[in-house]
Amino acid sequence: MARQVGLDKVRNIGIMAHIDAGKTTTTERILYYTGRLHKMGEVHDGGATMDWMEQEKERGITITSAATTCFWEPRYGIYKGKNHRINIIDTPGHVDFTVEVERSLRVLDGAVALFCAVGGVEPQSETVWRQANKYNVPRVAYVNKMDRVGADFFETVKSIKERLGANPVPVQIPIGQGEMFAGVVDLIRMKGIIYDKEDGSTYEEVAIPHDLESEAKHWRINMLEAVSEVDETLLEKYLEGEDITEDEVRKVLRQATLAGTIIPTLCGSSFKNKGVQFMLDTVVECLPSPVDVGNVAGHHPDTDEDIVREPKDEAPFAGLAFKIATDPFVGKLTFFRVYSGVLKAGSYILNSTTGKKERIGRLLQMHSNKREDLTEVHAGDIAAAVGMKDVKTGDTMCDEAKPIILEKMVFPEPVIQIAIEPKTKADSDKLGMSLAKLAEEDPTFRVSSDEETGQTLIAGMGELHLEVLVDRLKREFKVEANVGQPQVAYRETIKKAVDHEGKFVRQSGGKGQFGLVNLKVEPLEQGKGYEFVDAIKGGVIPKEYIPAVSNGIQEAMKDGVIAGYPVQDVKVTLYDGKYHDVDSSEMAFKIAGSIGFKGAVRKADPVLLEPLMKVEVITPEEYLGDVMGDLSSRRGHIEGMGDRAGAQFVKAKVPLSEMFGYSTVLRSMTQGRANYTMEFEQYHEVPKNIAEALQEKNSAKNAD
């Protein structure tokens, strides 16, 4: 199957936004206009094509990034009439699903950032924006819901500038706002566009309304000044009264967007079909193709040398698995982005992250949750493979003869856990397997068992995250389960470096056990996890026993010395030891490693850590005092407050343990008029009195 369009005519984009900015509706309209949908779905009635899981339809929020593909021919400018393929990844807007946003941004080349014209920049917009900055994703902004009462395009542009530190540059301004929203002034062509009142998908071009002429001129100069950073000649021509062609403006707008110096900003109302076609034109015109993004970097799995792959079909195949999903009809789907080369259905690839070979069964392109079989995929494509057994999110897939490992994805640790138990014997048989499948799909979801109680524990990024997963157990896997109260995922760490000897000796005639290790244990920067350094010289411990020492340490890390919580952020250096020709074994060194680590931690000022959450509450002014007082009573630290869209916002850092059931309290305190968002910030040392209480509670539990 030959390429349908050249690589320079491919756009891999995401649509990123706050939870209610109208993301799914906008994607629906895109698919409708690009000819992939016959009937437009509405999120209000649970009929939207992109929201394809039962829970998404019910809650009206998007949970799984569905990947879809469509084609578009711009109607103006340099790309006019040229067919382009747009691959879209719909990303969720709720903070509990930040991992979905993170992994989609990793494989995108550009993004459309959606803002609500009434709400402006909301808390999740900031989170998603920071994630996009991390990957240097060029963006176009689309101010949606211009037809709503209270819509204010210019106020939203101002909030993008102030709250996100971005440089939004309007390439359109609205004709009317709220119920009077009738169309836009196109600042590139200096023409008015008036949408049909009944069906916004049709419009007519008119002269710029008389009362908007001076405003349109002001914003056109603003646009030319903004792009002059990339090309000064354009502004000079304008100021000297010379004619500037449309194509000149478009070319420089594209350069400035790709350089990340500006965010071209448009407006519309997706629900009323107004503005989506112009947004599609801008996606093609301003966002990068894989050719613009250039080579992808990686390293050789054996030699560690740096390697680059060119985005070409002729280059060796390299791709990144960014999502695992279970499809009710075809089973496990591995979504991946092809960075270079061509991959054929039925061929073999190397998973260079694990070193295992995998056979590609079928190759599918997804249109939301509908499938289309492909015989091959090319550089720049986003597709799904069926039949891959051991590929996980973030693994590199590549040509066996030319191995490469692309940069890995890093996911946050879960912060909340609950006990889960099956309702019946039949459920009991299916629970383990079903949870394993869910954990395979979602790197921030963990399953473990409490050795003391035998309970199964599930951990995730928030209450909603776990609620949705328990719901999926019921719907997709037909497993009924009871869940306990949410528990905080506490951690332990150390504050100083110490040396310690770990010794395991059992010698009383016959085959004994002998292992002795000298360890240096020191604290690591937060979030670094565990680092093991083998500093053994002169073979004082044979090489084959060294991995066993590390395994013993990692076993011991699961159960901290203060209250039995996992230990994190430690570096362990094995620098000396002894072995016995006959009695030493892997088991002896594993136990010695474990004993040595536990002893070291006891001396290294161990402390208990708890997850600290970033909380933002938006409330009517009359409840501000109550909200702040309540946050302070929850050990919260108020970090800032201000005015937003006629309401007050409060930013605070609050321990997760104090936030359970907060939504109910907030609702009753503000008569349902306030709302809040919460996301994990970092682990933080627990105050002494609370640490002692936790210690006692744990001792009592162990005594039982």
Swiss-Prot record:
Keyword GTP-binding: yes
Protein's UniProt keywords contain DNA-binding: no
Subcellular location: Cytoplasm
SMART domains to which the protein is assigned, alphabetical: EFG_C, EFG_IV
Transmembrane domains' residue ranges: none
Pfam families, A to Z: EFG_C, EFG_III, EFG_IV, GTP_EFTU, GTP_EFTU_D2
Family that this chain belongs to: Belongs to the TRAFAC class translation factor GTPase superfamily. Classic translation factor GTPase family. EF-G/EF-2 subfamily.
Identification of the protein by name: Elongation factor G
Species annotation: Prosthecochloris aestuarii (strain DSM 271 / SK 413)
